[in-house]
């Protein structure tokens, strides 16, 4: 599946995207604000994508979309739309390499995912989680029109900041 905006193309993740995801998953900001995947090589990342991410999380129009900058045709980030066990609504997420930050790409990609969620998947609400200390992500969600709901435990006993957007 492919989604696009004026400046970006969002393609469903593939195992051959492993070099990009290895770089993203090992970015210090990704580790600090999202999760440490503890992947030590491109080969480990390829296996992770092939065995865990793609088969478990990418189906029924949901999953991880590699975000490409159209002008240079290079991957700069990821946007996701997931169904989580402890929630009733789809969860939008994003992460960008330093090369893709500060240019409005996260806003543009997330807005694209939101439009897809409403128009194609026919959802009336979408949610997003972010770590409480991730101020940049909170600002982005607020700019997109999300409302802060409070803290909610989503996994591993940690409470994340929950935001919602009603279409």
Please name every model-derived segment.
Residues 1-32, 66-167:
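Acyl-donor (CoA/ACP) binding surface of acyl/acetyltransferases
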Residues 25, 34, 56-58:
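Hydrophobic residues in alpha-helical segments
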Residues 29-51:
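Conserved GNAT-fold acetyl-CoA-binding loop/helix
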Residues 53-66:
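A short helix-loop-beta-strand connector motif used in the catalytic cores of GNAT acetyltransferases and
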């Amino acid at each position: 599946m492919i989604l696009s905006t004026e400046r970006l193309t969002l393609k469903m993740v593939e195992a051959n995207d492993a070099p990009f995801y290895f770089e993203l998953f090992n970015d210090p900001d990704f580790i600090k604000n999202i999760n440490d995947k503890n992947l030590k090589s491109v080969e480990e990342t390829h296996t992770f994508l092939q065995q865990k991410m793609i088969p478990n999380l990418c189906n029924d129009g949901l999953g991880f979309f590699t975000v490409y900058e159209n002008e240079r045709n290079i991957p700069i980030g990821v946007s996701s739309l997931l169904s989580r066990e402890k929630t009733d609504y789809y969860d939008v997420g994003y992460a960008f390499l330093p090369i893709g930050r500060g240019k409005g790409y996260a806003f543009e990609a997330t807005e694209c995912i939101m439009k897809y969620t409403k128009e194609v998947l026919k959802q009336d609400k979408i949610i997003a989680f972010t770590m409480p200390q991730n101020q940049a992500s909170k600002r982005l969600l607020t700019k997109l029109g999300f409302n802060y709901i409070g803290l909610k435990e989503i996994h591993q006993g940690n409470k994340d900041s929950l935001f919602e957007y009603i279409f």
